[in-house]
């Protein structure tokens, strides 16, 4: 089978995007696993590897244009990925010539649409992040409490206050100063809760958040199944939600969230029933177009693959330059 694929990123959270509908049959679990191994390795993978695979398939219940699956670089499957969803939204928008539609994910059908570019030649998409839950069973966590909201967890730290929230990916978030953001405690805590431990049996994404000013955040994330990453879309949304609930954020106001890989905008919404959802607005960049046989990709025969580099990363780098000057 011939394969058309894209290398994409949202805030430099990078993926290989593969549309399974181009094939007469869906890929097998074994083929997906082999592609993940061959493509995503940072040491031996294609184009320096990636944080994961984005698989686009037919929707299963007819209300969405397509379904997105997220396979992390370690082989685990994520329930959602905000940065990845933006790139899938762009792919589907250009494929189907639509600007606004919904995409099926593991737990929800999410609204997506094209948005005004963040900068010249930086394609930008806006996606819904929901549902939100603070219940321990949805994380899951075993701390002897039903919710963990702005509390010290002695097993993790005697000084840092944590909140656990699912959006729907599970996140453990702490607001910290600049020194703590970049200090050794972060890696110690993040690696502990993402290895065998009695509190978070499935691991959890961990984010440290520095408040830069009114409606301005910097979020650094250790992503479950990936490790430290340039950015995590759901982490930035979880952080924005908690900034609104616990700090001086305001519903419906745009928040600027900076990260190692760039910048996004978020807006936190409260519905009439008291639930929450977030908008995530950011780049959807295509860096490479890839074509070759499935057999060659499965075997890692990358010398037989045709790779075409776009000029989009150049424009994204120019955008980053403007951020560093602010």
Swiss-Prot record:
Q: Which residues bind substrate?
A: 13, 72, 82-83, 169, 205, 223-224, 233-234
* EC number of this enzyme: 5.1.1.7
Active site as annotated: 81 (proton donor), 232 (proton acceptor)
User: A GO CC term?
Assistant: cytosol
The record's Pfam families line, in alphabetical order, gives: DAP_epimerase
Under InterPro entries, the record lists: DAP_epimerase_AS, DAP_epimerase_DapF
Q: Which GO terms describe its molecular function?
A: diaminopimelate epimerase activity
Cellular localization per UniProt: Cytoplasm
Describe its function: Catalyzes the stereoinversion of LL-2,6-diaminopimelate (L,L-DAP) to meso-diaminopimelate (meso-DAP), a precursor of L-lysine and an essential component of the bacterial peptidoglycan.
Query: What is the name attached to this protein's record?
Result: Diaminopimelate epimerase
